[in-house]
Amino acid sequence: MGGTSTDVSLVVNNKPAVSSETEIEYSMPVHVPMVDVRTIGAGGGSIAKINEAGLLEVGPESSGSDPGPICYGNGGKNPTISDANFLLGRLNPESLNIKENIKIKEDTKSILENEISKKLKLNNYQSAEAILKIANNKMANAIRMVSISVGEDPREFNLFSFGGAGPMHACELARELDIPKVFIPARPGLTNALGCLVADLRQDFTQTLNISLEETNIKKLHSILEKFKSDGVS
């Protein structure tokens, strides 16, 4: 879980699930083998708002890193998941390098009250809890999507939670899904970068042939495979 989204994937016997077809933004299909990751708009900067029906929504819009959540003190004007965690005492102001802690906390309370609490007739702490509950439900559904939908039981897995915001939500997700154990790395915000450094390098070669099976030319197929082999070892 980062600033704009949460990415979820299933790892079975130390092997991540791989999909031959994945959708990226705007539902664009990509027919390239890649790790099967489901992405939802629930990150630390995801904006909480009241929709036209008068219901509380969280994401997919994000405040980004600039100005970012209100609690960053950079002029953010929209309540976010991070602001909810901040008001509930789950974020250390010192770790955010907040110099005017009291003023920023009052700004966060004021904006949350005007944008959310008054409209829902709740106090700020109830609103913050509601924001986190909606975010956690979205993340729990994403975990169900990569596990239950493919015949796996999340109760038989452990939850490995990382990203700058992930560990703050891990225990609630584990309780919701009856996941027995939660693992949090020493530096969760750096885990993605570390993964890029230590992961095995892999290359996949694919080519589309728009011909019927009856028209398939074995020699042509062999020539394509030989080219793949040549490209792979070069």
What annotation goes with each model-predicted range?
Residues 2-234:
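N-terminally biased helix-coil "hinge/interface" segments that flank
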